[in-house]
Every structure is written in structure tokens, then in C-alpha cells.
């Protein structure tokens, strides 16, 4: 077999493939063995028709499509290996010659991975972020812990304040008619949380348990239920209970309740400071890397094929659906709730998809330019991390990857990570 690659404009080209006649005849034999099981010829049992009789009645051409189905995938894959091109979409195949006793000749119009013209990627600047943790930061974190440990206590004869939780019944009406989903009993609503329509919670401030009120609001214009969007509504509300947060004392006992590993409030404060310092250092490092990656990709010149963007959109849509499933939803439910279509969702994601593709192509080009590769030892360490994370043995993790085509994906990801590390090592901090 021979293969010739001819580059056209943009990211397209034509792959001309010539497959020897022996391979064609071999594929025709396989095709006959498959097809003969399905044909009926008078005087012969199904599957027992001689080849010559079959060709006399149906013609050898009846085998061509099945033979092509056998030949093309293998020949196309071999041609890609021979020419070293990197297709990013399905090819358009044009059969130029296909007949018994002769070579198969076909042309494949292929969209390939684009060439990347790197711009500046060494010496890129990033803003040094202050990661200092102050005493006030620690106190704020301590206050948040105190808030989370607070108990809701019913307050008798006291009016609702901001931050209180009201236990209430409500029923909503638009144009004097009750609407679906507008009614609840014994609903707990934290005042100021913004759970309800703007203006609803504010009008409950000052009410006491046992009191009733008509709350007048207007649904937002962008409200998800179109039949209610922009319309004024009246909610009949009855307050059952008013609950207020009762904060625990900030003392050693509180510290031990929050964290079993500490014995005093001072120890807890020290631990909180260390965690804040670690978190801020991690956040600063993430921002630095993100800044450098974005600058390097913006400096590169790339003509990105639409096919690569569409593939990334498919991946992003799948990731989005997985997040929805974690919340007990699926795409169909999301579209119904949001009023969006799949086309609108993809259009909304398209800019981010293009950025992702641009970033990956840029980092891959930097890795190639700087001869950065992931070693077998790097892959082994990554597998060990995965084994620890999922509490499995390394051999089990390897077996899983073996069923999925091996660890080439890990090696490619590590190569990209080395490119990011390279950007960091060759960057400049500015204040």
C-alpha cells in the first residue's frame, strides 16, 4: 500500500491511497463469505452457493460495498500512520478505482490538526498576589465556623429581623388566580437569603408569629416560567414561628467541638491560619498558571478547525450533563426548566470551547518546541496517585486503563502539564 498527502488551503488536505490488488481480492473473499449467508438462489441451500454462480447471478459488484467496509478502515488507518498526519474529523472518501483483480485507489479529504505559530511564551509576566493572612482573616473564618454551629431557636413575641428564619404558609395569586407551584405550608425561609422573588423577604420584616399579610411583588422579566414573567402577584402569607440563630461561645469547648484534633481555641486559630495560608498559596499559584497559559495562547497564531471546536463542545456538553446528574437532573429537564435549546447551550459554550482548544494546541506546541516528554516513571507516579485517591491497587488502576486503550492519555496530559510548568519556570513576577 502507498499513501500520498497533499496539503490544501487552511487545515485541509487530500490523502491518496493505493491498496494492492491482493488485498482487494482478499477483502472480496471475506465479503462473499458474509453475503452468501443471506442470499437465496434456487437449487442451493442458503450459504452454499458457489462463488461463480453467485457472481453470474448478482455480479461481483454486489460484493464491492462489503469489501470496501473491510478495506477502508484498515487502509485509512495505515495511510495516517505512513504520512504522519493528525486528522481531527471524519474524512470524506472518494473511491477512484474498485474492481476485482485491480488495486483499490481512493482519496480522502481530511481536516487535520492546525499548525501553531508560537508567539512569546518565555518571560511572560504575572502579578504577584499577596497571600498574607491577617488576624482579621482568622477571626472572620472563626466567625463563619461559629455561624455554622449556631442553633435556630424559636423566639416568642418578637418581630422578624434580617437573618431570622420564618416558618410560614404562603399561596400566590396572579390576576386573582392561584398558580402552579405558588403554594407551600410550614416553609422555612431565611430572611435576606434571596431565595424568593425580590421584595418578598423584605416585606416579612416586622411580622410576628400568628400574623398574616398580603405580600405584593412582581416576577422578574427573565423569570423561568414564561406565563409568570413580568407579572404582578399577591402572596397571602401566614407566619407560624420566628427562629433566630443562637451562637455558641467562642471558647476551648467550642474549638474541640469543631475539630477533635485541637484542645484549645488558640490551637484552632493556629490551624485555621495554616489552612488559609495554604489555600491562598494554592489560589495564587492557580491564578499565576492561568494567567501565563492565557497569555501564551493569545500570543500564538492558530487557525482552529470548526471540527475541533465541535468536538470540544461535545465534551463540554457531556461534562455539563454529568454535573446536572449529580443534582438529580438531566439535559432534557434542564432545557425544560431554563427554556434553552441544545443549540443555544452550545452557542453559549462556543467561546469557551474555542479557548480550550487554543490553550491545548498552544501547550502541546510549546512541549514539542522544548522537547518536553512524560517518561514511563512519570506515568507510574501518576498511576500511584490515582491508586491512592481511589483506594485501589496500582495493578487495578493499570487494568482499568488497559481496557480503555492504555495510558497514552495520561502521558499526553502529563506532557501538557510539563509545558505549563515550563511557562511558570520561565516567567517574571511583577508587583
Curated annotation (Swiss-Prot):
GO cellular component assignments: cytoplasm
Coiled coil: none
GO molecular function, one term: peptidyl-prolyl cis-trans isomerase activity
UniProt-annotated location(s): Cytoplasm
Keywords on record: Cell cycle, Cell division, Chaperone, Cytoplasm, Isomerase, Rotamase
Domain PPIase FKBP-type, first and last residues per copy: 163-248
Isomerase listed as a keyword: yes
Gene3D superfamilies recorded: 3.10.50.40, Trigger factor ribosome-binding domain (3.30.70.1050), Trigger factor, C-terminal domain (1.10.3120.10)
EC number(s) reported in the record: 5.2.1.8
Reaction equation(s) it catalyzes: [protein]-peptidylproline (omega=180) = [protein]-peptidylproline (omega=0)
A Gene Ontology biological process term: cell division
Annotated InterPro entries: PPIase_dom_sf, PPIase_FKBP_dom, Trig_fac, Trigger_fac_C, Trigger_fac_C_sf, Trigger_fac_ribosome-bd_bac, Trigger_fac_ribosome-bd_sf, Trigger_fact/SurA_dom_sf
Pfam families hit by this protein: FKBP_C, Trigger_C, Trigger_N
Protein purpose: Involved in protein export. Acts as a chaperone by maintaining the newly synthesized protein in an open conformation. Functions as a peptidyl-prolyl cis-trans isomerase.
Domain-related comment: Consists of 3 domains; the N-terminus binds the ribosome, the middle domain has PPIase activity, while the C-terminus has intrinsic chaperone activity on its own.
Family, per entry: Belongs to the FKBP-type PPIase family. Tig subfamily.
Record's protein name: Trigger factor
